[in-house]
Amino acid sequence: MISISVKESGDKKFLNQVMEVIKENYKNSYFEVSDFCEAVGVSKSLMNKKLQSLIGQSAGQFIRNYRLNIARELILKNRETKNMNIAEVAYEVGFNDPKYFTRCFTKQFNVTPSGLMNHEE
């Protein structure tokens, strides 16, 4: 019982650190898995192993999905005002290629970013 709670608290601490690092760095388009691992203080293999077991994603998938979820929130907030276009949203969340962003977004959410912005979901 004690080892389980220690493991759970260790996993929780790890995930809290992971979230803190991603929140601080996701806008940086040069922030990639190696930087992520270095900031958390673990090897790439350990990062991937732990994230896969805890949330079912590799480090690369986690970074991309985090960025896409933030982008989705930005698009939903910008529906009425249209203060940002899709390319600006892509750059804001750390993608440096709007076309790649659109492909990833569409695959993740089954709607294009512009479709979501224009209420076509």
Question: Where are the regions a protein language model picked out?
Answer:
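Generic structural signal for short, solvent-exposed loop/turn connectors between secondary structure elements
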Residues: 1, 118-119
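Basic, amphipathic alpha-helical hairpins
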Residues: 19-31, 51, 55, 73-84, ...
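Short, Lys/Arg-enriched, Trp-marked, Pro/Gly-tolerant hinge/linker segments that flank
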Residues: 1-16, 53-61, 65
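General nucleic-acid-binding
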Residues: 1-7, 14-46
